Amino acid sequence: DVGRVSDLFAISPMVMMDDYWYLDSFSFVATKYGLTSKEKRDGVSYTNLERQGYCEITTLESGVIDDERVLEKIEEMVYQNDWEVNGICFDPYQFGTLLTMIEKRHPEWPLIEVSQTTMVLNMPTKQFRDDVKNGKIKHSGNPLLTMAVNNAYTKVDNNGMRIDKNKNSNKIDPLDAGLDAYAVCYLEPFDGAGYWTDEKILNGGTLF
């Protein structure tokens, strides 16, 4: 889920287990209008979360997110975890530059456009909600992902249901990114050959 200045740029891997999906997230934080003011406005210490490995604060003088660093982080996740990438799911808004970079460097990665509209996300959002309740989606307690879930509410219109936020400082980007992935994943059957074991997760395994 792309963010440039005010929002987070969130990467939320959805990993198939034996009988559930494991969701985690990593965010990039812009500093265009100052990190201190952003932390105060969002009510989040990104500085502390960066130390804990949940996010990365941009080092560009402009304060915007560096697409090169985003792609490097995705590559790190894939290589360190030895993933077989079945899809890079993305909202096309502001994704053009990174899309071109991925196409050039990783033509083997399927690119799947998921527009963040109610019509597209209605069924995935309903299924995501139900699957979280039924234990078919689990996550590690990631604080930025937890914050996003707490900040989100479901909005219903004539086309169905999707998530939204009450105000701009309520960040939901990690959850938006997860729903982009789940728009594809929720249709996938479990084949009993999940990527990780419960034991690895319980022993503190991390995707990052």
Tell me what each language-model feature is:
Residues 1-116, 122, 126, 139-208:
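RNase H-like, metal-dependent nuclease domains and their acidic two-metal-ion catalytic environment used
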Residues 124-134:
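Short, surface-exposed amphipathic charged segments that create phosphate/polyanion-binding patches used
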